[in-house]
Amino acid sequence: MKALAVIRPPSICSWPPQSLPKSQYLRSQRFRKGGVMDEVFLNLFRKKMVEEVGWDSGKPGYDGLIEVANRLMLESPTNSHTKEAAVRILRSLFPPMLLQLYKLLIAPIQGGKVAAIMVARVTAITCEWLMGPCTVNSVDLPDGTSWNSGVFVEKCKYLEQSKCVGICVNTCKLPTQAFMKDYMGVPLVMEPNFSDYSCQFKFGILPPLPEDDATLKEPCLDICPNATRRREFTRNINVQQCPKA
């Protein structure tokens, strides 16, 4: 009598495939399945932005979100107005008491280390729909210590799609830095790279003064649609700095 082959179902321990890190596997599955939660986050964020701007794009999905962000920047009388509007949008995404309690109870623990590390992890988990693939990394603090409170964005989808330094700076970088510090008690500096569209978040570190921030002196991107329109009306453009940065 021949022995019957025993067919063993795959165990939980053997999944995901050994060749793929668990975090990378889960991320690939989320995107492969259409990203239900990504769609929820996108729709919520766009809804809040539309309420602030008072206008919506006819385009669906992410393309429409970028058009609303562009409208927010172009219709604001000053860059400060754009930043303040973007901060209000970020605040509207959270229950007010949550922000207050986080700033009061979590932010002071261990000199801000716990809060910075927590926010970095939450950002990496929940914001890929907006920025694209990102990972938590270590950042060096001014006192010489290191915290795992950084988030490295490989290629920011928001910057790549908007193609605009001004949108990056005024609707993302500056308002996010201000929101984190003022409403969550966590200092943050964001360092976008306009050459490869990567971005480094450093939670727990104060941003430089405006006059020392090289990001605010960036020229317009060659592919910026707003810069292209300006060139159609005038040749006297300061190409050394984006007028909206």
Residue ranges: model-predicted function:
Residues 191-197:
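A short beta-turn/loop motif at secondary-structure boundaries
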Residues 156, 191, 204-206:
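Structured beta-strand/turn binding interfaces of compact recognition modules in eukaryotic regulators
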Residues 161, 169-191:
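Conserved short secondary-structure elements within globular domains
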Residues 126, 151-153, 176, 190, ...:
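Generic structural hydrophobic/aromatic packing signal, biased to beta-strands
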Residues 197-207:
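C-terminal edge-of-domain segments
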Residues 2-170, 208-245:
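N-terminal accessory segment detector
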Residues 147-149, 184, 197-199:
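Core residues of folded domains in eukaryotic genome-function proteins
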